[in-house]
A protein has these predicted regions:
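Bilobed "Venus flytrap"/periplasmic-binding protein-like clamshell domains
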Residues: 1-38, 55
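Alpha-to-beta junction loops
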Residues: 2, 43-52
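Extended ligand-binding regions for polar small-molecule ligands
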Residues: 10, 56-57, 74-147, 158-160
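Sec-exported extracytoplasmic/periplasmic mature domains
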Residues: 17-22, 43-47, 62, 101-109
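Conserved beta-strand segments of alpha/beta enzyme cores
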Residues: 28, 69-71
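Pocket-flanking alpha-helical
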Residues: 39-41, 56-66
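C-terminal functional modules
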Residues: 134-188
Length: 188
Protein backbone atom coordinates (compact mmCIF):
# COMPACT_ATOMS: atom_id res chain seq x y z
CA UNK A 1 0.00 0.00 0.00
CA UNK A 2 0.85 3.65 -0.02
CA UNK A 3 0.84 6.35 2.61
CA UNK A 4 -1.27 9.43 1.94
CA UNK A 5 -1.07 12.76 3.76
CA UNK A 6 -4.21 14.80 4.35
CA UNK A 7 -6.01 16.99 6.89
CA UNK A 8 -7.82 15.13 9.66
CA UNK A 9 -11.59 15.44 9.95
CA UNK A 10 -12.13 17.00 6.52
CA UNK A 11 -14.16 16.04 3.48
CA UNK A 12 -10.80 15.67 1.73
CA UNK A 13 -9.96 12.82 4.11
CA UNK A 14 -13.30 11.14 3.31
CA UNK A 15 -12.95 11.72 -0.43
CA UNK A 16 -9.46 10.22 -0.37
CA UNK A 17 -10.75 7.12 1.42
CA UNK A 18 -13.62 6.72 -1.03
CA UNK A 19 -11.33 7.19 -4.04
CA UNK A 20 -8.71 4.68 -2.91
CA UNK A 21 -11.35 2.14 -1.88
CA UNK A 22 -13.18 2.46 -5.22
CA UNK A 23 -9.89 1.75 -7.04
CA UNK A 24 -8.92 -1.13 -4.73
CA UNK A 25 -5.79 0.72 -3.61
CA UNK A 26 -4.51 -0.12 -0.13
CA UNK A 27 -3.35 2.97 1.69
CA UNK A 28 -2.42 4.26 5.11
CA UNK A 29 -3.75 7.74 5.95
CA UNK A 30 -1.30 10.13 7.59
CA UNK A 31 -3.52 12.95 8.85
CA UNK A 32 -2.68 16.26 10.49
CA UNK A 33 -4.68 19.18 11.89
CA UNK A 34 -3.00 21.99 9.94
CA UNK A 35 -2.30 22.30 6.23
CA UNK A 36 1.32 23.34 6.86
CA UNK A 37 1.86 20.14 8.87
CA UNK A 38 0.50 18.05 5.99
CA UNK A 39 2.80 19.77 3.48
CA UNK A 40 5.83 19.47 5.76
CA UNK A 41 5.21 15.74 6.29
CA UNK A 42 4.78 15.12 2.58
CA UNK A 43 7.83 17.23 1.70
CA UNK A 44 9.87 15.31 4.29
CA UNK A 45 8.93 12.02 2.61
CA UNK A 46 6.58 10.73 5.31
CA UNK A 47 3.88 10.16 2.66
CA UNK A 48 3.87 8.85 -0.89
CA UNK A 49 1.07 11.19 -1.88
CA UNK A 50 -0.80 14.21 -0.57
CA UNK A 51 -4.38 15.24 -1.21
CA UNK A 52 -6.48 18.35 -0.77
CA UNK A 53 -8.39 20.67 -3.12
CA UNK A 54 -6.58 21.16 -6.45
CA UNK A 55 -6.13 24.86 -5.84
CA UNK A 56 -4.66 24.05 -2.42
CA UNK A 57 -2.30 21.46 -3.90
CA UNK A 58 -1.09 23.94 -6.47
CA UNK A 59 -0.56 26.67 -3.88
CA UNK A 60 1.07 24.39 -1.29
CA UNK A 61 3.41 22.95 -3.93
CA UNK A 62 5.09 26.35 -4.12
CA UNK A 63 6.11 25.97 -0.44
CA UNK A 64 8.03 22.74 -1.00
CA UNK A 65 11.82 22.55 -0.99
CA UNK A 66 11.88 21.45 -4.64
CA UNK A 67 8.46 22.29 -6.12
CA UNK A 68 9.45 21.15 -9.62
CA UNK A 69 9.90 17.60 -8.32
CA UNK A 70 6.18 17.36 -7.53
CA UNK A 71 3.14 17.40 -9.80
CA UNK A 72 -0.56 17.91 -9.29
CA UNK A 73 -2.22 14.91 -10.90
CA UNK A 74 -5.09 15.60 -13.31
CA UNK A 75 -7.58 13.29 -11.57
CA UNK A 76 -10.44 14.97 -9.78
CA UNK A 77 -11.66 12.84 -6.89
CA UNK A 78 -14.46 15.17 -5.80
CA UNK A 79 -16.11 18.44 -6.74
CA UNK A 80 -16.47 20.93 -3.93
CA UNK A 81 -16.72 24.45 -5.33
CA UNK A 82 -14.85 27.08 -3.33
CA UNK A 83 -15.75 30.74 -3.28
CA UNK A 84 -15.47 33.96 -1.32
CA UNK A 85 -16.66 33.96 2.28
CA UNK A 86 -17.51 36.69 4.77
CA UNK A 87 -18.21 36.70 8.47
CA UNK A 88 -21.74 36.08 9.62
CA UNK A 89 -24.01 38.94 10.58
CA UNK A 90 -23.32 41.45 7.82
CA UNK A 91 -25.82 40.58 5.11
CA UNK A 92 -25.19 43.75 3.09
CA UNK A 93 -21.45 42.99 2.86
CA UNK A 94 -22.28 39.36 2.02
CA UNK A 95 -24.52 40.55 -0.83
CA UNK A 96 -21.84 42.93 -2.15
CA UNK A 97 -19.21 40.15 -2.16
CA UNK A 98 -21.59 37.67 -3.80
CA UNK A 99 -22.69 40.15 -6.45
CA UNK A 100 -19.09 41.19 -7.12
CA UNK A 101 -18.32 37.59 -8.10
CA UNK A 102 -21.58 37.37 -10.06
CA UNK A 103 -20.60 40.58 -11.88
CA UNK A 104 -17.32 39.04 -13.02
CA UNK A 105 -19.05 35.84 -14.17
CA UNK A 106 -21.82 37.70 -16.01
CA UNK A 107 -19.30 40.03 -17.63
CA UNK A 108 -17.48 37.03 -19.09
CA UNK A 109 -20.77 35.53 -20.23
CA UNK A 110 -21.67 38.75 -22.08
CA UNK A 111 -18.18 39.29 -23.51
CA UNK A 112 -17.50 42.35 -21.36
CA UNK A 113 -13.80 42.79 -20.59
CA UNK A 114 -11.71 45.32 -18.73
CA UNK A 115 -10.78 46.77 -22.12
CA UNK A 116 -14.29 47.16 -23.55
CA UNK A 117 -16.38 47.76 -20.41
CA UNK A 118 -16.93 51.49 -20.99
CA UNK A 119 -18.11 50.93 -24.55
CA UNK A 120 -20.74 48.47 -23.31
CA UNK A 121 -22.73 51.36 -21.82
CA UNK A 122 -24.23 51.85 -25.28
CA UNK A 123 -25.06 48.17 -25.88
CA UNK A 124 -28.46 47.25 -27.29
CA UNK A 125 -28.75 44.53 -24.63
CA UNK A 126 -30.57 45.87 -21.53
CA UNK A 127 -28.92 43.24 -19.29
CA UNK A 128 -25.48 44.44 -20.32
CA UNK A 129 -26.52 48.07 -19.79
CA UNK A 130 -27.75 47.21 -16.26
CA UNK A 131 -24.52 45.34 -15.51
CA UNK A 132 -22.34 48.32 -16.44
CA UNK A 133 -24.62 50.83 -14.74
CA UNK A 134 -26.03 52.54 -17.82
CA UNK A 135 -29.59 51.53 -16.87
CA UNK A 136 -31.46 50.70 -13.70
CA UNK A 137 -30.47 51.16 -10.08
CA UNK A 138 -28.61 47.93 -9.35
CA UNK A 139 -26.22 49.44 -6.79
CA UNK A 140 -28.90 51.18 -4.72
CA UNK A 141 -29.92 47.96 -2.93
CA UNK A 142 -26.38 47.74 -1.52
CA UNK A 143 -25.89 51.44 -0.82
CA UNK A 144 -23.55 51.72 -3.81
CA UNK A 145 -23.59 53.96 -6.85
CA UNK A 146 -24.74 52.63 -10.18
CA UNK A 147 -21.26 52.11 -11.67
CA UNK A 148 -19.83 49.86 -8.94
CA UNK A 149 -20.07 46.83 -11.28
CA UNK A 150 -18.38 48.75 -14.06
CA UNK A 151 -15.46 49.61 -11.76
CA UNK A 152 -15.06 45.93 -10.80
CA UNK A 153 -14.90 44.90 -14.44
CA UNK A 154 -12.50 47.71 -15.39
CA UNK A 155 -10.18 47.09 -12.45
CA UNK A 156 -10.03 43.27 -12.25
CA UNK A 157 -11.69 42.15 -15.47
CA UNK A 158 -14.29 39.50 -16.01
CA UNK A 159 -13.94 36.10 -14.33
CA UNK A 160 -11.98 34.65 -17.26
CA UNK A 161 -9.53 37.56 -17.32
CA UNK A 162 -8.99 37.34 -13.58
CA UNK A 163 -8.55 33.54 -13.67
CA UNK A 164 -6.06 33.77 -16.52
CA UNK A 165 -3.99 36.51 -14.88
CA UNK A 166 -3.99 35.16 -11.32
CA UNK A 167 -4.15 31.39 -11.79
CA UNK A 168 -3.61 30.09 -15.33
CA UNK A 169 -0.70 32.37 -16.28
CA UNK A 170 1.09 31.54 -13.02
CA UNK A 171 1.01 27.83 -13.88
CA UNK A 172 -0.97 26.99 -10.74
CA UNK A 173 -4.01 25.56 -12.55
CA UNK A 174 -3.65 26.29 -16.27
CA UNK A 175 -6.83 24.37 -17.17
CA UNK A 176 -9.99 26.08 -15.94
CA UNK A 177 -11.88 22.79 -15.67
CA UNK A 178 -15.04 23.43 -13.64
CA UNK A 179 -14.11 27.14 -13.46
CA UNK A 180 -15.49 27.56 -16.98
CA UNK A 181 -18.82 29.16 -17.73
CA UNK A 182 -21.69 26.67 -17.75
CA UNK A 183 -21.98 27.24 -21.50
CA UNK A 184 -18.47 25.77 -21.85
CA UNK A 185 -19.02 22.78 -19.56
CA UNK A 186 -18.10 24.44 -16.26
CA UNK A 187 -20.18 25.22 -13.19
CA UNK A 188 -20.22 29.02 -13.48
Amino acid sequence: GISACTNIGTTTELNMRDFFNSKGIKYEPVAFEKADEVVAAYDAGRCDTYTTDKSGLAAQRTKMKNPDEHIVLPETISKEPLGPVVRQGDSVWEDIVRWSLNTMIEAEEYGITSANADSMKTSDNPQIKRLVGAEGEMGAAFGLDNEWNLRIIKQVGNYGESYKRNIADTGILPDRGPNQLWTKGGIL
